[in-house]
């Protein structure tokens, strides 16, 4: 699975982007650098049972153990103390990144109810794409019986593209179901 996506990039996407943008060198062609999956835990961070369930869920989705993000400073209004766990994140690179991207495009996103493609508004101006998932049940690895509370997370796809247009073209060639740009 992961080899297919990597080979698709090397054999089809690189020559296509070189022709489209007139790159002289293969190293100039935009590529995927990493995919970050992040989840804020909120109230669940106070209970170790809920925290463990969230970490296990992220590990199953990503195929890699997540790291716990801790508060850097205390905020009384949010009842947060310095060093308290507030979220969890996973950074995928290389083969795991390509495997996750393929599962996201071909298995997970089509399971979204009333799916008409993902918004092209998620680009940040520097060639990276951010996507919010509202419901973890769209991943086939997650069983409805194991979920205590529906909770979403953020997926950031970091590329080496200089512009959003290049990143859009790169992700579109990978098969990402992006809507037309406005």
Swiss-Prot record:
GO terms for molecular function: rRNA binding; structural constituent of ribosome. Its main location: plastid. Gene3D superfamilies: 3.30.1440.10. It comes from Emiliania huxleyi. The gene is rpl5. One of its GO terms (biological process) is translation. Binds 5S rRNA, forms part of the central protuberance of the 50S subunit. Keywords: Chloroplast, Plastid, Ribonucleoprotein, Ribosomal protein, RNA-binding, rRNA-binding. It holds the Pfam family Ribosomal_L5. This is Large ribosomal subunit protein uL5c. Belongs to the universal ribosomal protein uL5 family. It comes from the Eukaryota. It is found in: Plastid, Chloroplast. The lineage of its organism: Eukaryota, Haptista, Haptophyta, Prymnesiophyceae, Isochrysidales. GO terms for cellular component: chloroplast; ribonucleoprotein complex; ribosome. The keyword Lipid biosynthesis does not apply.
